[in-house]
């Protein structure tokens, strides 16, 4: 008798997610903006309404990814701070402590795959809008989508690199302190 295959962590199966509701909303916002852009005019005959709904879905996707999905699915968060005195702007990155939080391989895979695929799809739609030259307003909507999706992609990529670098630095720094303390104590005992 054949045994049914068991789903393993890391597969693209939302049921394996540690946070399935967060994951479904994340994927829902990501795909709904694309679907509204592609098929909205077929079902809603009002161009302005399709434009506004797509813009609202893009904004909801940006907010949800930045503030909720990134933190819950991969333990990363970012924001931009502006020094009011100088007007200088800098990005702040935050990551969960790997010792206290385990990230699901399925959540991680869905998150990063969707994070990189969505801007690629919008780039394809931008090329299509340029080639068609049917309406500049559609190109402006795609440009807004590209700004929002690429901003999140760049920010989370930097946040992940920052998180990995600080984890390695903490391990190296923490290991050296323990080695120095242990070496110093043992050296004093056997003097």
UniProtKB/Swiss-Prot annotation:
One of its GO terms (biological process) is vesicle-mediated transport. It comes from Aspergillus fumigatus (strain ATCC MYA-4609 / CBS 101355 / FGSC A1100 / Af293) (Neosartorya fumigata). Its main location: Golgi. Belongs to the TVP23 family. The chain crosses the membrane at residues 16-36, 38-58, 110-130, 136-156. It holds the Pfam family DUF846. The keyword Transmembrane helix applies. InterPro entries: TVP23-like (IPR008564). Golgi membrane protein involved in vesicular trafficking. Keywords: Golgi apparatus, Membrane, Transmembrane, Transmembrane helix. It is a multi-pass membrane protein. This is Golgi apparatus membrane protein tvp23. One of its GO terms (cellular component) is Golgi membrane. It is found in: Golgi apparatus membrane.
């Amino acid at each position: 008798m054949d045994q049914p295959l068991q789903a393993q962590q890391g597969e693209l199966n939302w049921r394996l997610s540690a946070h399935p509701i967060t994951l479904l909303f994340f994927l829902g916002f990501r795909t709904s903006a694309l679907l509204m852009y592609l098929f909205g005019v077929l079902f809603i005959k009002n161009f302005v309404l399709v434009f506004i709904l797509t813009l609202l879905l893009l904004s909801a996707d940006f907010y949800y990814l930045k503030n909720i999905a990134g933190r819950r699915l991969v333990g990363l968060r970012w924001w931009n701070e502006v020094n009011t005195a100088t007007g200088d702007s800098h990005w702040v990155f935050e990551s969960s402590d790997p010792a206290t939080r385990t990230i699901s391989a399925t959540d991680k895979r869905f998150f990063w795959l969707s994070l990189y695929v969505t801007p690629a799809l919008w780039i394809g739609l931008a090329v299509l809008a340029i080639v068609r030259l049917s309406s500049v307003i559609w190109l402006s909507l795609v440009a807004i989508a590209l700004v929002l999706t690429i901003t999140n992609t760049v920010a989370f990529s930097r946040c992940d690199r920052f998180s990995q670098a600080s984890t390695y630095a903490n391990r190296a720094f923490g290991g050296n302190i323990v080695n120095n303390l242990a070496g110093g104590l043992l050296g004093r005992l056997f003097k």
